[in-house]
Each structure stands twice: as structure tokens, then as C-alpha cells.
Amino acid sequence: MSIRSKFNKDEKKFVKFIDSTEEIIKHLNKSDSSKRSRLKLSGQQIDVLESNFKIDSHPNSATKSLLSNALSIPLKNIQIWFQNRRAKEKTARDGGRRRSGNAEIEDGEYEHGKMSYQAMCPFDFPPQERYFL
């Protein structure tokens, strides 16, 4: 029940060999605490991002870089903010409801993509006698 350490000087990597379940649990708990915390944006930063989103919901890399520098936010967070904001807008536009694969349409038919149920199945339902002659 010990931790053996091995240091490879060439690769400059530190490797731990864990021998017991207790040590594995301890190691996993340590990993959770090292998780990066969420970046909190100020109201002013959000206002700037929102105003830019109204102008262009898909900004180019130069615009994102300028926003990153001006707002002191990492570029990756700018990209993620725009991605999340586009998803939020799409959800609001769709009415906030999830769409299923099949949407019921008039006449009791079901639409799947662009092909209606009748187009997929050439038989009449319920089956008529002519099919069983």
C-alpha cells in the first residue's frame, strides 16, 4: 500500500504507480479539486458581447481576438460564449420545445424528415382483401 514514483529525466514526466483502492480514491478526489473554476463575466462584459452578437452572431477570428483583448477574456471563452448564445437563440426561436424525429401532420399521417409515411409504405392500411387473393 504505497505509492512508488518514477521520474524519467529524458521525457520530464512524473509517473505514479498506485497500489491500493484507498490511494486510488484519494488520487481521484485530488483531481476533482484541481478542476478549473468557471469564468464569471461582469455585466459590462456581457453587454459588450451581446451588442456584438446583435451585429454578427458568427464573428470572424479577428473580431473574436479583439473582443478577447478588449475584455480580458481568453479567446476560447469568447468562442464558447458565442456558441452558447447561438444555441440559446435557436432554442428561443424554436419555442423552447424539443423536436422529435416524427412530427404529426394533418390527415393522421406522420412526417419523417421530408418523406411522409404514405410515401414510405405503398400499402393501404388497413389492408384490403385484394392483397390476400
Curated annotation (Swiss-Prot):
Region (Disordered): 86-109
Entries under CDD domains matching the protein: homeodomain
Protein name as it appears in the record: Homeobox protein HD-5
DNA-binding region: 34-93
UniProt-annotated location(s): Nucleus
GO cellular component: nucleus
Chief location bin: nucleus
InterPro entries given in the database record: HD, Homeobox_CS, Homeobox_domain, Homeodomain-like_sf
Keyword Transcription regulation recorded: no
Keyword line: DNA-binding, Homeobox, Nucleus
Highest taxon of source: Eukaryota
Keyword Nucleus: yes
GO MF: DNA-binding transcription factor activity, RNA polymerase II-specific; transcription cis-regulatory region binding
Pfam families the record matches: Homeodomain
